[in-house]
């Protein structure tokens, strides 16, 4: 299979899976294994296509991101979504990521650990659906600092490969009495700084594996993941309010079984 086709397929996988509660890591490892695209070059490629998905969110939520630069609501102590909400949502995962980055990359990016993450994340999502209570926050401006911090703490679970950032944060939001749409949007916003930091750190360590010959392949993957991520996020927000997290949880369990059959056995 040509590099361009491989890039196109993996770009679609990344764009679909990055911001959905189904684990982009698990999908990329499984599909990469089936395509025979593995090793350091593959890891560097995954970093690049993640940047495409990140850019999609940055564009979709550019107005909200720009508004976070306005510190007046924060200084006036207005009950309005502001940069401190994002800080509370980001800080726990940043600390966890910095402390555990090398351990995670060395020991946890293994097929069997990803299977554990897929199943554990599915259990959390089902638990959140069963235990969720009537929402008190129906928009980002309703979000309290306590709710933001709670979701931020749940984001720490996503440092474990296969757990899913969206799955853990949306579950945390439901348990903190935040509705689906608001939990999802906050999940996307707090994912940006964490992903930019983690991806940037990985890219600094991996850029030596790149060559000029890789540019066409990496460009196709980047553009594909960007376009697909934009479409996936818009569709997901509409779908989630209708079907909830359980179908995604069941899909994760199915993926864990497929992962075990095709990768581990």
UniProtKB/Swiss-Prot annotation:
EC nos: 3.6.1.27
One GO MF term attached to the UniProt entry: undecaprenyl-diphosphatase activity
Highest taxon of source: Bacteria
Cellular compartments per GO CC: plasma membrane
Reaction it catalyzes: di-trans,octa-cis-undecaprenyl diphosphate + H2O = di-trans,octa-cis-undecaprenyl phosphate + phosphate + H(+)
Record field: transmembrane: 4-24, 42-62, 84-104, 108-128, 184-204, 217-237, 245-265
InterPro entries: UppP
Places the protein is found: Cell membrane
An annotated GO BP: peptidoglycan biosynthetic process
Keywords recorded for this protein, A-Z: Antibiotic resistance, Cell membrane, Cell shape, Cell wall biogenesis/degradation, Hydrolase, Membrane, Peptidoglycan synthesis, Transmembrane, Transmembrane helix
Membrane-related topology note: Multi-pass membrane protein
Function of the protein: Catalyzes the dephosphorylation of undecaprenyl diphosphate (UPP). Confers resistance to bacitracin.
Misc. remarks from the entry: Bacitracin is thought to be involved in the inhibition of peptidoglycan synthesis by sequestering undecaprenyl diphosphate, thereby reducing the pool of lipid carrier available.
PANTHER family: UNDECAPRENYL-DIPHOSPHATASE
Similarity field: Belongs to the UppP family.
Protein name: Undecaprenyl-diphosphatase 1
Phylogenetic placement of the source organism: Bacteria, Bacillati, Bacillota, Bacilli, Bacillales
